[in-house]
Amino acid sequence: LAQLRGHTLPLRTDWLDAIAGSLIKEALNAPLPWSYRGVIHPDTDPILLTLIDTLAGDGFGKLAPSTPQPPLPKDVTCELERTAISLPAELTLNRFNPNGLAQSQVLHRLAILEIPGIVRQQGSTLTLAGNGEERWKLTRPLSQHAALIEAACFGATLQEAARNKLEADMLDAGGIGSITTCLSQAALAGLASFSQQLLEQLTLLIAQENQFAEMGQALEVLYALWRLDEISGMQGAQILQTTLCATIDRTLWLCESNGRPDEKEFHAHLHSWQALCHILRDLHSGVNLPGVSLSAAVALLERRSQAIHAPALDRGAALGALMRLEHPNASAEAALTMLAQLSPAQSGEALHGLLALARHQLACQPAFIAGFSSHLNQLSEADFINALPDLRAAMAWLPPRERGTLAHQVLEHYQLAQLPVSALQMPLHCPPQAIAHHQQLEQQALASLQNWGVFHV
């Protein structure tokens, strides 16, 4: 059999194929176990199972020292020795000290290459989150060395291989979320330098994103890494600056072209507005981000806040962002004017956007409270009941202390300052819209009685 295959000496597969051909006389329902990888097929012949079990044994072999190998396994061994990591072990480290950071970066590079036996049991997915503690379970399974040999196709050193593997993953990413995840892994692994070709391709990939609600998390993570992640060496990295600028540009494009978000995307939609506003506010305060035009972004926000056919949520969010940027035309009066232009059903959505982005500028202004109270008084009973759920939900953006301040100002507006603030914050045993509906029914009943001459005011 070896001679037929052109082998000078019989190889292991020659011996196994010869034994199988000699012992098995019936057709096989599954391929030979040594012809594929993974779990043995359930229909494998019992003779083959016995053969594998007998020949496999309990020992672990080693490649002969003269066996040609790629340089990656040796480099990994050197990196593990340099950082004092031994396998097997259970390792607890802290990324906020130099030794722990070096160990964490080596282990994260191995995890990027999907090397068996390298499992992180505890730790944050972001470099800037948490207390920096990580717990790893390190083993040396039989498949580990083979996986290192296969991973050598990405590079000769651990750093190069992990970087090239991440580049391949980012090019295969299905959206901005996957790209952000890869860049978070790069930060954990201390990989800040990537090829210029990747930067150009990432810009094209991000320009294909079509979901505004997906941009918030990406903006938040990318901006934090670009501006603050000095520990991992990602602060000001070119890869982050390129992707961040492309993401901001795409977000601005989407916020002017998207429609009304559905219920499932409502909070993610607002999160995107908040993340965008946070970055624009920092640019307004003097942060330099080449490639992003603050004046163009402000002009877009002005257009969006005044667009009659735009969703009320976006109009409110755009005006709230302008207030955060201290735009001269964005004020409490402008917010009241916009609310007056909208239908009662849209007022709650607009208030959502306003308070989500500019609650400090609005909730504590007596002029806005007085004007908003006047706006509510002009609504009919039916319109008020329909708008009440959205209006109450919008107030949920105020934290407890700010709700107390708002309640105090509402009492002062109605000249009821002698009442405690808790009078407006007492929990109700039924929904407020139900109370308003019952009050409406009561007024209708009294009007009917008065019409019949039974009741007189």
Predicted regions located by residue number:
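Extended repeat-based interaction scaffolds and adjacent low-complexity, acidic/S/T/P-biased segments
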Residues: 5-457
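Core structural elements
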Residues: 1-2
